[in-house]
Swiss-Prot record:
Region (Disordered): 1-23, 128-180, 595-619, 634-664, 1152-1360, 1413-1456, 1468-1513, 1527-1573, 1616-1670, 1731-1809
Signal sequence segment: none
Name assigned to this protein: Protein REDUCED CHLOROPLAST COVERAGE 2
Gene Ontology terms for molecular function: mRNA binding
Basic residues: compositionally biased ranges: 1-17
PTM sites of type Phosphoserine: 1244, 1320
Organism: Arabidopsis thaliana
InterPro entries to which the protein is assigned, alphabetical: CLU-central, CLU_dom, CLU_N, CLU_prot, TPR-like_helical_dom_sf, TPR_rpt
Positions annotated as TPR repeat: 892-925, 934-967, 976-1009, 1018-1051, 1060-1093
Subcellular location: Nucleus; Cytoplasm, Cytosol
Gene3D superfamilies, alphabetized: Tetratricopeptide repeat domain (1.25.40.10)
Function: Negatively regulates meristematic tissue proliferation by integrating developmental signals with carbon source availability. May act as the scaffold of a protein complex, which sequesters key factors that are required for the G2 to M transition in meristematic tissues. Together with REC2, REC3 and FMT/CLU, contributes to the establishment of the cellular volume devoted to the chloroplast compartment.
Gene name for this UniProt entry: REC2
Keyword set includes Cell cycle: yes
């Protein structure tokens, strides 16, 4: 363990530190490479890359992947650049490939590469051709078909549940089945039958291209003598048969390849030659390259694989006796299984001496340790490889020679060999499964000491550990334990070497790694095949009797082993002495130090007593304070002096005791110095734990107490919070071992995890796997003839995993379970009965067994429901399993943990700095392509993702995935995590189809490992949902969301934050279907959970409140539409109040139609009021999209009906009568007093992401995520727009403090309310005399405005003012099945009545108990906003049917509801309208239209100071004035508002101009990005991540990047491209007011080069016809497990914790609540016709600017802190919102913009990212 950082380091000034760290920030670099054929390839690299990395990038690029033997030259640096050259030093970054001559070895390697590239067409079994997922139907069928993805239901149905909750499992199947029946119709049946875990046969389908014609059938060395004389440069000849079946002979020479006798055709590359001489090869190879690009155009090509997974490649199943190697490992062409030391040249190495020199090397500074660690890593890796080779070699000899016959008792003894310094001891395993042998690398047998001595040794090592603990412990460093084929070998260095002074000066001479650490030893390559070669005829001749006899013998052997072992186990005494792992001591010290530091911090905060502040004293005041302090100190001393004499007698006895104590301490100190080194003792004293005053025995007892009372409960608590999220036994073991916990405590973990069924399930499965492992190992050890091993293993697996069908099988089943129960009881101290766990995840158990015992199986769909699922030939081989100490860089791991901790706290700049340093450290120690480094790449990718730099994140994660696949295995948890994370990154880069491939692969592996009932799986469901929604499959997305909800409810509880996140995601999904009343119900549950768990002050709670308010307003809009006479949809669902998941699913069943209609008739409430416009559901969709996506970090849960009911009850208590069922006449409003409102915070620990970070982007624009470099320089938030490649640059998501005003901007909603506003511009139609731009205000806009004003007036903790009673909706069934956007939901509207609640605009604070006040404020703001809009309309348009709705008085009790007095409201509304209209005398019609569309924007952002943003400024000002006036005059009372305006009480005026949905649609298509259809500012909250690691380790989700603009404006116009909505996604959901992602956290602006995505760049209006889609930027799930790959836990929290949002901008200014104007310097392309392509909702012309200076000044009051942001954002149209090619400018917009009213300048209220829409694909 590393010592506490910073103790010995001098303090640096903050500025100094920042400067230094800024230098290490990585950036994306484009590397241009010229190929030999003079074409150019552009690679995307990172500034930390070297020439070695460029070679790797070339190897995974389709144009250059077949090049192997070349050097790289640079016009300045010269030729043959070394692999270590940094690419940042190459100016310009343009390289040239120079072909080099071949040696025979290199020519062989070149052929191996070609075979490797084409292997995917033959080696990985059957595959399906890719299917385009553009149409809903196709995607529906493809849901489970895209590579490996399956619907959650499939997995649920097929994979057995945890066994601990079989009942939920059944209901789950049933409800999901119902859902499938409706949404997938005919496909549902097959979906349910297809269960991923049972489809092991599809394991390799993800990599298989067998649907293509193999370009090459074979390549062989030619055995024919060449006809011509062999040339001097010729190396050898090969025979090639290409795809057409035509054979060719090719000569390999030093200069290249050519057909014999045709040297004029000489080509340096074999591919080029074959393309010239064979058209069929050319066509087949070209088709393969195209398939590679379709698979993943950014890299991660499916070759370079090694057979390193327990499931062998399908090609092996055809010839198990020969095991055809994959090309990389094919010895015929120079391949091998990796590693070093095969040749035996290291047999005589002086290991003892070199380990001793390592331990003596200087290691005081990080630099010294890095040098030492590099040598230690290389030496130890070499030692491990040599040891494994030697051990396996000796074991194979023993097994083949049958030297260890079981009939000879002596044979069970040791077989020992000595090889140089190495001693290899091999022993046959005991066929007794109950035998417990300690064969750990640091166990009693290896170290040859007793248990007590071992416990003391490990504890002392742990409590004195530092960065060098591993290297200094040479006795364990030099040990490897290998188990293989029923034997165990212990390899250790002969003896410790005593160094003298001369040796200390020596250095270790060791070779560097080849290929940067890639191609490490694949232990599977050392397999022992279990089938001897035999001809097919001999197999056919075998009689069935022989096979059945063999099976009978094997079965009796298995039965005998179990029976004998069970007898011995039952009489085995319980073990009393428990060992101690050294990690426990290290964690214990850290725990105590953390406690001490927290106490000291609390004391610091408590000690200083607040002194009364006396202002105006200046320096004299400070002087007086100092004098007073001195007097106090003197007085204190004199008092002590007076007391002293009285205590003299006591002092004498005390001194005697003191002497005695000192004597004891001296004795203990002497003893300690004998036990540990002097430096270790000093470390122990400095640790301030007091351990140096205790004896070892006392410490052991204390450590055991810490273990039981603290360590175990803390582990379970971290499981519950999802800070740790193990997905299988391996990750569970790693987490426990890293904390020093023993696996024998699994029983205790199960007891403590009573409320965590997924953790209990993992523990139970791991205990069962271990019980099975002992049986299987004993059976293998008991087999006398190696030829019978395969049969015995298959028979044993049948007994353990099969389903009994006959009497004999039933008996075997009985004794098997008796063994398991007894084993668990004896070894784990837990009483378990298998009857309570009917359904086990048998494939998970099979996988665990294969890992632990070392089995390789054929990939096929094993029928576990039969008695004999396994056959002899299914068991291919046994592979060695070995253990050793891990040796890497402790400093690197510490930096990784620091990075993760910073990420958790939202300190993105620090997280990037630490992550970059950690990566550099691990690259220096382990090499860039070693499995240890992959964890650093992965973590840094997640950190960069949170900063919004998706390009860089993707590049790093691709590197990690490539390493994990090739070095760790295709189903390793780290590999799984990389698939999931990469899917999220691709999604954020708007490559939805590609993202779906990878997320489905991750989901397939999750089902295989942890099953469907796991938080990581639920989190992945949410990611799949958002991607499915992006592919226009809204109903499929809903099914995944329901699955996630049920899963989270079942696993984490109905009141867990993750469950709330699932409710929230579903609420957004429903809103996309216009089912707002259902959204309200689900969001109410979200809010209640968050209020109870986090409190009303938490940002997530506030966000949820904002969303609820938004949904309520939308539901009211629907009610208004209903009054207009639009067809009344089915209200059956909404009338039921909050529905449980199963109830919702019931609505999807076919027979529910009648019930739904009945319910509809009953539930239809009567509504008073005049018809208003029917709003378009545009922004909501986005909202949903984003939100669904955002759950990325969440793991969704779902709850049963009962849970829902109980939840609803509690909700009703907290939020009075949220249940819509209790609705009274709809014309009455029920004001509900929610306790507090919550929203998901992107950075939250629970995986919540900010719903709507401060920035919102302008409504209409459909923008792409801005991918910019991370700029940590706080001096300038804005970065120069990078126009070079049209890259979008930095998005800063501003954050605001809770006291700042939260103002929503039009179109870019900072809160859900703002979304409502967005709608107002929606109806801007030019062809209508009542200009749609000024669109008559309808209730929707009124609500929006009210929300906006509300935000202005309200303090951060917003209370949801209205509980909407929505009554008239389509049935859930109709909603779920209807294509997105086809159903217009209409809900009878209830207008809220509100009481007066004067508030200070600047920092009004609302008490939690004062919701009524908040409600009143909301109403007032609503009125103001509406008034503004109506006024504008009056000025330039004909007024049509305005509906004025006034809020009648509300009593203080939120429960009381009064009728809305429409008439009174109308009377009072007009005066205000007139006043407002007069306020804007000089505005042109178009300007006013723009303003109206922006009225919503009023809240937009306080950055009104922008010179170009006068328009929005005016709007804000007007709205503020209105709000003020209203607030002041509510109920006739006038209060001073910040603006000082007061006016008679007015009511909300809602313009009732009726507008058809189709009109709105037309309008939408006309909009340009900036003023585009009032894009309801929907930002989707992204949920904090996980376990991506998402899995922290592997399970988790990525929260949306902190730095991403919270809202990407979405153009609601439909787009034809398949990923339309993806580009328009908004990263976060609406947010009421300040608050950072988590609690703190700086949003770091990054200039990120855009990732290639050319398909959606053009901006034709007709392109926007696609259905709405979820926010692509929504946070995705990255399962949140904390460990770094390779079992090095980065931190208990996992990598992916969402960052905490700090409220400081990049330039150090506090973020404005509405700082929408974050400059996003995206280079913007101006439309060629010279028109700004879209109106910017707040951008004003120079004309307006002069007219509204006063107002902009006033606006500064509203948000001064936005000033900095605003100034930058308002600069030029380049920074502005002027749209690139998003949408063609319509004539209407042209008119609006003619007057210059809306130039492209960016205004502070504009949240558009300035992103350039066109992104070129460069890779």
């Amino acid at each position: 363990m590393a010592p506490k950082a910073g103790k010995t380091k001098p303090h640096k000034s903050k500025g100094e530190k920042k400067k230094k760290e800024e230098k290490v920030l990585p950036t994306v670099i484009e590397i241009s490479v010229e190929t030999p054929d003079e074409s150019q390839v552009t690679l995307k690299g990172i500034s930390t890359d070297r020439i070695l990395d460029v070679r790797k990038l070339l190897a995974v690029h389709v144009q250059t992947c077949h090049f192997t033997n070349f050097s790289l030259s640079h016009q300045v640096r010269g030729t043959k650049l070394k692999d270590s050259v940094d690419i940042v030093s190459l100016k310009p970054c343009h390289l040239t490939i120079v072909e080099e001559d071949y040696t025979e070895e290199q020519a062989t390697a070149h052929i191996r590469r070609l075979l490797d590239i084409v292997a995917c067409t033959t080696a990985f079994g059957p595959s399906k051709p890719p299917v385009s997922r553009t149409l809903p139907k196709d995607s529906e069928k493809k849901e489970s078909g895209s590579t490996d993805g399956d619907s959650p239901t499939e997995k649920d149905a097929g994979d057995s549940n945890s066994g601990l909750s079989p009942k939920p499992k059944e209901s789950e199947k049933k409800s999901v089945g119902a859902c499938e029946a409706q949404s997938a119709e005919g496909a549902a049946k097959s979906d349910i039958d297809m269960c991923p875990p049972t489809r092991l046969g599809q394991f390799y389908e993800f990599f298989s291209f067998s649907y293509l014609t193999p370009p090459i059938q074979y390549i062989r060395r030619s055995v024919r003598p060449s006809k011509e004389d062999k040339g001097l440069d010729d190396l050898f000849q090969i025979d090639i048969k290409v795809s057409s079946g035509k054979p060719f002979t090719v000569v390999a020479s030093r200069t290249g390849f050519y057909p014999p006798g045709k040297q004029q055709l000489l080509c340096h590359s074999l591919v080029e030659l074959l393309q010239q001489i064979s058209r069929p090869f050319d066509a087949a190879y070209d088709a393969l390259m195209k398939a590679f690009i379709e698979h993943n155009k950014f890299g991660n090509l499916p070759y370079g694989f090694r057979a390193n997974t327990w499931v062998v490649p399908p090609v092996v199943a055809d010839s198990p006796s020969t095991f055809p190697s994959l090309p990389v490992e094919d010895e015929t062409w120079g391949g091998d299984g990796g590693g070093v030391g095969r040749s035996g040249k290291y047999d005589k190495r002086k290991w003892a001496k070199e380990f001793a020199i390592l331990a003596a090397m200087p290691c005081k500074t990080p630099e010294e340790r890095q040098v030492r660690d590099r040598k230690a890593f290389l030496l130890h890796s070499l030692f491990v490889d040599v040891s494994v080779f030697k051990a396996v070699e000796i074991i194979k000899k023993i097994v083949e020679n049958n030297q260890c016959s079981l009939k000879d008792p002596a044979a069970l003894g040791f077989h020992e060999e000595r090889i140089g310094d190495l001693i290899v001891r091999v022993a046959r395993d005991d066929p007794d499964a109950s035998a417990k042998l300690d064969r750990k690398s640091d166990g009693t047998q290896v170290l040859e000491i007793s248990q007590e001595e071992l416990a003391q040794r490990n504890l002392l090592k742990g409590i004195t550990a530092d960065e060098s603990a591993t290297v200094h412990d040479t006795s364990t460093l030099g040990v490897v334990v290998v188990r293989h084929c029923g034997c165990t070998a212990i390899v250790k260095v002969a003896s410790e070497f005593k160094l003298n002074d001369g040796h200390i000066l020596q250095d270790i001479d060791i070779e560097d790694q080849s290929e940067g650490g890639a191609n490490a030893l694949n232990v599977n390559s050392l397999r022992t095949l279990l089938h001897k070669s035999s001809t097919p005829s001999s197999l056919a001749q075998r009689s069935p009797n022989a096979d059945s006899e063999q099976i009978r013998v094997a079965k009796s052997l298995v039965r005998k082993v179990i029976e004998d072992s069970l007898k011995k186990l039952e009489i085995e005494p319980s073990r009393y002495s428990k060992p101690i792992r050294w990690e426990l001591g290290a964690c214990w010290v850290q725990h105590l130090q953390n406690q001490a530091s927290s106490k000291s911090e609390s004391k610091k905060t408590e000690d200083p007593k607040p002194e009364p502040a006396v202002k105006g004293l200046g320096k004299q005041g400070a002087l007086l304070k100092e004098i007073k302090r001195k007097i106090d100190v003197k007085a204190n001393k004199t008092e002590q002096g007076k007391e002293a004499p009285a205590n003299d007698t006591d002092n004498t006895s005390e001194t005697e005791d003191q002497k005695e104590l000192e004597k004891q301490n001296e004795e203990i100190e002497k003893m300690w110095k004998e036990l540990v080194t002097e430096t270790a003792y000093q470390r122990l004293k400095e640790s301030e734990t007091g351990f140096h005053l205790k004896s070892p025995k006392e410490l052991i007892e204390m450590a055991r107490k810490y273990y039981t009372d603290t360590a175990l409960p803390k582990l379970v608590a971290d499981f519950g919070s999802l800070e740790l999220s193990p997905v299988d036994g391996r990750t569970l073991t790693d987490f426990m071992h890293t904390r020093g916990l023993q696996m024998h405590s699994l029983g205790r973990v199960v007891e403590l995890a009573e409320k965590l069924p997924h953790v209990q399930s993992l523990c139970v499965h791991e205990m069962i796997v271990r019980a099975y492992k002992h049986i299987l190992q004993a059976v293998v050890a008991a087999v006398e003839n190696t030829a019978d091993v395969a049969t015995s293993i298959a028979t044993c697996l049948n007994v353990l995993l099969g389903t009994p069908s006959d009497t004999e099988s039933v008996y075997d089943e009985k004794i098997k379970w008796t063994w398991v129960e007894t084993f668990i009881s004896k070894r784990f101290g837990w009483d378990w009965k298998h009857e309570g766990c009917q359904e086990l995840r048998k494939f998970s158990i099979l996988r665990g067994l294969s890992h632990k015992v070392g089995l390789e199986l054929v990939p096929k769909d094993y029928e576990m429901d039969t008695s004999y699922p396994f056959k002899k030939f299914d068991i291919i081989s046994m592979v060695p399993v070995y253990k050793h100490v891990a040796c890497s860089s402790a400093d690197g791991r510490t930096l990784l943990e620091s990075s993760k901790t910073s990420l958790d706290k939202g300190k993105l700049e620090d997280a990037v700095n630490y992550g970059t340093k950690a990566l550099a450290k691990l690259v220096a120690v382990c090499g860039p392509y070693h499995r240890m480094t992959a964890g650093a790449y992965s973590l840094l990718a997640v950190v960069l993702y949170h900063t919004g730099d998706f390009n860089q994140a993707t590049i790093y994660q691709q590197k990690a995935l490539d390493i994990n696949e090739r070095e760790l295995g295709l189903d390793h948890p780290d590999t799984m995590k990389s698939y999931g994370d990469l899917a999220v990154f691709y999604y954020r880069l708007q490559h939805t189809e590609l993202a779906l491939k990878y997320v489905n692969r991750a989901l397939y592996l999750l089902h295989l490992t942890c099953g469907p009932s796991h938080p990581n799986t639920a989190a992945t469901y949410i990611n799949v949902a958002m991607m499915e929604e992006g592919m226009k499959n809204a109903h499929v997305a809903l099914r995944y969301l329901h699955e996630a909800l049920k899963c989270n409810q079942r696993l984490l509880g109905a009141d867990h934050i993750q469950t709330a996140a699932s409710y929230h995601a579903i609420a957004i999904a429903l809103s996309l279907m216009d089912a707002y009343s259902l959204s309200v119900q689900h969001e109410q549950t979200t809010l209640q959970i968050l209020q109870a768990k986090l409190g009303p002050e938490d940002l997530r709670t506030q966000d949820a409140a904002a969303w609820l308010e938004y949904f309520e307003s939308k539901a009211l809009e629907q009610q208004e539409a209903a009054r207009n006479g639009t067809p009344k949809p089915d209200a059956s669902i909404s009338s039921k109040g909050h529905l449980s998941v199963s109830d919702l699913l019931d609505y999807i069943t076919p027979d529910s139609g009648i019930k739904a209609r009945d319910a509809q008739r009953k539930a239809r409430p009567k509504v008073k009021g005049k018809p208003g416009q029917s709003p378009g559901p545009v922004s909501e969709e986005n909202q949903k999209d984003d939100e669904i996506l955002s759950p990325a970090h969440l793991t969704g849960e779902s709850s049963s009906d009962k849970e829902n009911k109980s939840e609803t009850k509690s909700e009703e208590k907290k939020v009075e009568n949220f249940d819509l069922e209790q609705s009274k006449p709809q014309d009455q409003l029920k004001l509900v007093k929610p306790e507090a409102t919550v929203h998901e915070d992107d950075d939250s620990d629970e995986g919540w992401q900010e719903a709507v970070p401060k920035n919102r982007f302008s409504s209409g624009r459909r923008t792409r995520p801005s991918l910019a470099k991370l700029n940590t320089n706080f001096m300038n938030v804005t970065q120069q727009p990078s126009r070079s490649r049209g890259k979008s640059t930095n998005f800063t998501s501003p954050r605001t403090s809770s006291n700042e005003l939260s103002i929503s901007v039009a179109g870019s909603t900072s809160s859900p309310a703002s979304k409502m506003f967005v709608k107002s511009p929606l109806n801007k139609k030019q062809n209508n005399s009542s200009v749609v731009g000024e669109r008559p205000v309808n209730d929707k806009s009124a609500l929006a405005s009210s929300a906006c004003t509300e935000q202005i007036n309200k303090p951060t903790p917003m209370l949801s003012p209205v509980s909407v009673k929505a009554g008239k909706l389509f049935s859930y069934k109709e909603v779920a099945l209807a294509p997105p956007g086809t159903i217009v939901k209409i809900v009878a509207e209830q207008l809220p009545e509100e009481t007066k609640a004067p508030q200070n605009l600047d920092a009004a604070k609302i008490a939690v108990d004062g919701p009524e006040k908040v409600n009143a404020q909301d109403a007032e703001s609503e009125n103001k906003h509406v008034a503004t809009e109506t006024e504008a309309e009056n000025t330039d348009c004909n007024e049509q049917g305005r509906v004025v709705v006034g809020g009648s008085e509300l009593t203080s009790s939120p429960k009381e509801i009064k009728n809305v007095e429409v008439e009174k409201a109308a009377e009072k509304a007009f005066p205000i309208e007139t006043a407002v209209s007069n306020a804007r005398p000089g505005k042109s019609k178009s300007a006013q239209m723009a303003e109206d569309s922006d009225t919503c924007l009023l809240n937009k952002s306080p950055t009104a100071n922008d010179s170009n943003g006068s328009e929005s400024v005016i709007g804000v000002k007007l709205q503020k004035d209105l709000c003020d006036a209203e607030l002041k005059t509510v109920d006739g009372e006038t209060e001073n508002l910040p603006n000082g305006d007061s006016s008679p009480k007015s009511s909300v005026a809602a313009d009732g101009e009726k507008q058809d949905a189709c009109e709105a649609q037309k309008e939408m298509s006309k909009k340009l990005s900036a003023s585009a259809p009032p894009y309801t500012p929907t930002t989707i909250p992204i949920f904090g991540s996980i376990a991506v690691p998402g899995f922290k380790d592997h399970g988790g989700i990525l929260p949306s990047p902190l730095n991403m603009p919270p809202m990407l404006p979405i153009n609601h116009v439909r787009r034809s491209t398949p990923h339309q909505s993806v580009t328009a996604r908004v990263p976060y959901g609406p947010r009421l007011s300040g608050g950072g992602y988590n609690r703190s956290g700086n949003r770091v602006p990054r200039n990120k080069p855009s990732f290639p995505n050319s398909t959606e760049s053009n901006g034709e209006a007709n392109q926007f016809n696609g259905p709405r889609i979820m926010n692509p930027h929504a946070a995705e799930f990255i399962p949140s497990q904390p460990w770094v790959s390779n079992g090095y836990p980065v931190s208990p929290n996992g990598y992916l914790a969402s960052p905490n949002g700090a409220e400081i901008t990049q330039n150090g200014y506090p973020l404005s609540p509405v700082a929408g104007g974050y400059p996003c310097n995206m280079s913007v392309t101006q439309p060629q016709d010279g028109l700004v392509s879209e109106e910017l909702p707040g951008a004003g012309s120079s004309e307006e600017k002069s007219g509204s200076e006063e107002e902009s000044n006033n606006d500064k009051n509203a948000g001064e802190d936005d000033e900095a942001v605003g100034q930058e954002t308002t600069d030029t149209p380049e920074n502005g919102h002027s749209t690139v090619g998003e949408v063609e400018t319509t004539s209407h917009e042209t008119c609006d913009e003619k007057n210059g009213e809306r130039q492209g300048g960016k205004c502070w209220g504009d949240y558009s990212d300035n992103e350039i829409e066109q992104i070129e694909v460069t890779s």
